[in-house]
Amino acid sequence: MKKYMFRFATVVVKFTPAALIMLAKTNTYMKPPEKYDTDKRYRLAQWICNTLRRLSLTKTQVFGLENLPKDTGYILCPNHQGKYDALGIVISHEEPISILMEEKQSRKLVANQVIDLTDGKRLPFDDPKKQIQILKEIGEEVKNGRKYLIFPEGGYEYNRNTLQKFNAGCFRCSFDSKTPIVPVVLLDSWKAMNSNSLMPCVTQIHYLKPIEYDEYKDLNKTKLSDLVKERIQEKLEELLKERGA
């Protein structure tokens, strides 16, 4: 068993009965997809995510919901710590959001269903041309009002509350859509499914003030990536300092 996978393995075992319900409901909701609107499909995705949260003995505290922009599309950009990250955000974000995920990871059980239910996108890391096409599509969708969840780090390596390198290319969507970027800070999210402890845990989600287009329009993708990372790093350090970490 991989390092830090014991907790996740127990969640998988406990989730097996619910998985049968999930598969049946997802198939019903997606065939044909137009039978169920975006909101109904998103509520099912939230149910799936919330079921996993309960089985992982996780409580998530959410801060800054008032910072989410109104009447416009936007892109959520969180740090990445583990398997629970997207689940926690979907649970806490009342309006439907779509998710961008690496293609191979997106084909796994639960991820596959959540991506379908949220009208998300699958990004092939080995096909640069397809990547550009998908990012353009996301930019157009966000311009038309859709909300997207994108992890600039692209993955996680048991980094816990430490940031990794941000991939500047994903910020193409923001320049194309000219919409706000909402930096999101995840604290202790790794504890939910990427640890060996079976004790209840508490994670935090902090939605920071959005970075408006006027603030980043004169930057290039690398500078914008640095700006978003800096906002997340500052808040993360503040939170860790508050608890004496």
Briefly describe each language-model feature range.
Residues 1-74:
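Membrane-anchoring hydrophobic helices of lipid-metabolizing enzymes
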Residues 2-5, 132-245:
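Non-catalytic C-terminal accessory region of glycerolipid acyltransferases
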Residues 7-18, 104-107, 111-116, 183:
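The first long alpha-helix at the start of the GST-like C-terminal all-alpha domain
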Residues 22, 26-29, 37-41, 55, ...:
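Catalytic core of membrane glycerolipid acyltransferases/transacylases, capturing the structured
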Residues 55-63, 130-132, 187-189:
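Short gly/ser/thr-rich secondary-structure transition/capping motifs
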Residues 61, 82, 107, 131-135, ...:
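Amphipathic coiled-coil/heptad-repeat helices and related helical stalk/stem segments
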Residues 62, 121-125, 213:
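Short acidic-hydrophobic, aromatic-tinged amphipathic segments that line or gate anion-handling sites
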